[in-house]
């Protein structure tokens, strides 16, 4: 009996999530996210104040996102063969240096939109490589059975970073953007130093080296890896359906992201603060949603149904909330926050658990590129249409397209998507 009881306790006791490496990557993420949230929103305000144009604001977003259309696919196969950890902390050191250079340019009064565009393009390039490396390395630091809990923490941290947005606006309106850039210089440097102390073994590198004899030469190896990555995506109908849907979701998100802040600034007095109130409730919703997912496991056999419900409801809420009074917008955005973190948690934990470690780089690279193409199309089309069409109508149309994609791509692909979503992870 004692032996059976001990065995039962072992089975019921989950693996510890908060290992040394997971703690380091989490703290490092918090530090860098805080800096990014501060400077990112301030840069958006700077572009709007400098250009006075919704289209130019959309163009700024496109310039930042453009590298994501190509770079993830190019770097994905290489990140399946080389150290993702080293890539992560190296890029954080580079980001720290770049923000220091941008600070110096602004202090020397050399600012111009072309310089800002070049800086945004470089930051976008770094970001596009970083997130493929991070998304592929992060699962290696999660102990078995803790994927859902770990990704609920990640989504909650992103939400907490949004708390810095009001501070960003206050600092920007008071003393300008330079102090925020200098703060970002420090946060990225601290995060990079912390990440150098992660000790996880990257065993997938040896696996890839052992299987690399079939292809020789850098270009031939890259072509072979990229082809295999695409073949893998097409061979997995569930992953393909998820990827296609999130292209449409990214399209709608790109349209919304490009038009919402300009809409609030042009519609309300001190519109950036009204924007923060409304979208701040979304952050609160994401925080509460993340806490719920950390404490409560979704029923395994209902995950697909929950995800489809979330996709449809998000489309309806985000497509209509701008037609209501501010207090109603806040309530609707609170709901969007809770549902958004649910969508993220189900998708990321399921796909990262499903895809083998040695294929994660290629899958995440391809998935990221497809999402970026959707976002870029949404930003460009929405920005151009906003010059002569009502902003709210454009956003509603984009969300209606997203709604149709949820029904026809995810709904009709239920048989294959369930195999990925309805799994304990």
Predicted feature residues:
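C-terminal transmembrane bundle of multi-pass solute transporters/carriers
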Residues: 70, 81, 85-87, 91, ...
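Hydrophobic core of transmembrane alpha-helices in multi-pass small-molecule transporters
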Residues: 30, 112-129, 328-342
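Hydrophobic alpha-helical transmembrane segments
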Residues: 113-118, 124, 149-208, 276, ...
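Loop-to-transmembrane helix entry/capping segments in MFS-fold secondary transporters
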Residues: 54-55, 144-154, 272, 357-367
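A single, central transmembrane helix in multi-pass transporters
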Residues: 30, 175-182, 221, 225-290
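Pair of pore-lining "gating" transmembrane helices in MFS-fold secondary transporters
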Residues: 13-48, 121, 234-255, 334
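Juxtamembrane intracellular "pre-TM" segments in multi-pass secondary transporters
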Residues: 4-22, 201-243
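Intracellular juxtamembrane helix-capping segments at the cytosolic ends
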Residues: 43, 129-142, 342-355
